[in-house]
Each structure stands twice: as structure tokens, then as C-alpha cells.
């Protein structure tokens, strides 16, 4: 699988899912931490729980704000601050974590529309309209230094496998 590009991570038994909304305009803000409530006794927050039950994440049962220790919340904020300094995320995204005891692990960053979890912001006073308006305004004001150099896939096409590209 590694040669084909799959990333595998170990299963973290008896962990909880924690979700946080991130916005970068007009300044960096984080929503409250959400803890989704699983619809069954499953160990995992399943695809069915996340996207099919009750109309998806927005209609799912949750603790919002999550009843978590302040130290755990501070760890999440520290990870988010580091993440934003590294990835140059713009606009709105949802960041998913797993927690077990006093440890928190970054699981994924959801930057695609449909994964924004805009409902996370209503709890702290931002409507979906406010968020969309801020995203549009951010694109008008910010210039980026993105380039399409290397986007033709030449480097990957000439590599014998992904591992050789990663070093």
C-alpha cells in the first residue's frame, strides 16, 4: 500500500472524537470544541454516524462545547496554532482530533466544502452568512504567492514509487 500512496494509522482504541472549526479572517478564531455523540455502542465514530445519521454532522447529537479538561483544550489550541503556522490554511476548515485520557492527537484537516461544519460557529455567534461573507472578503484582500509549478505531476511520474519521493 505504501508504494501506491496509502497512509495507514494505528487504531486508537477507547478514544473520543473532538472537532474544532477554524477561521482565518478577519482574524484567526476557533470554535468551541465539539464531541460528537455516537449513535451506537461502536468503538469508532463511523461513517454512518458521521455522514448518514440525522442528516450528517449538522444534525448529529453532540456535546458543544465538549466537556473536556482545560489542559486538553489547551493542547488542542496549541496544535491548531502550530498547524496554522505550517500549513497556511485560509478561510474555514474543520480539524478533527482523537483524544484518549489526557492525550490528544491530530486526526485530519477538512478543507473541502461540505466538511466545514458551519454549525460549530452558530454557537459562538457567527451565522453561515457571516462566515461565507468573510470567506469572500478574505479572497478579495489577500494575495498569495501560490504557483502552479510542479503541478503537472512530472516529479511523481518519473519516481519509481512514492517512498523515493518522500526520502
Regions found by a protein language model. Give the residues of each.
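Phosphate-binding site of ATP-dependent enzymes
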Residues: 1-59, 67, 99, 104
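ATP-dependent carboxylate activation and anion-phosphoryl transfer catalytic cores
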Residues: 67-167
Amino acid at each position: 500500500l505504501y508504494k501506491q500512496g496509502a497512509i495507514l494509522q494505528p487504531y486508537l482504541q477507547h478514544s473520543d472524537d473532538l472537532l474544532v472549526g477554524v477561521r482565518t479572517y478577519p482574524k484567526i478564531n476557533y470554535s468551541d470544541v465539539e464531541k460528537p455523540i455516537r449513535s451506537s455502542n461502536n468503538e469508532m465514530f463511523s461513517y454512518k454516524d458521521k455522514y448518514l445519521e440525522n442528516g450528517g454532522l449538522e444534525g448529529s447529537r453532540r456535546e458543544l462545547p465538549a466537556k473536556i479538561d482545560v489542559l486538553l483544550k489547551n493542547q488542542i489550541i496549541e496544535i491548531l496554532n502550530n498547524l496554522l503556522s505550517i500549513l497556511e490554511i485560509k478561510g474555514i476548515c474543520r480539524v478533527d482530533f482523537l483524544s484518549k485520557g489526557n492525550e490528544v492527537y491530530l486526526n485530519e484537516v477538512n478543507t473541502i466544502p461540505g466538511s466545514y461544519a458551519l454549525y460549530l460557529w452558530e454557537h459562538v455567534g457567527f451565522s453561515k452568512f457571516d462566515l461565507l461573507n468573510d470567506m469572500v472578503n478574505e479572497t478579495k484582500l489577500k494575495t498569495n504567492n501560490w504557483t502552479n509549478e510542479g503541478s503537472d505531476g512530472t516529479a511523481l511520474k518519473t519516481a519509481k514509487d512514492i517512498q523515493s519521493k518522500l526520502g
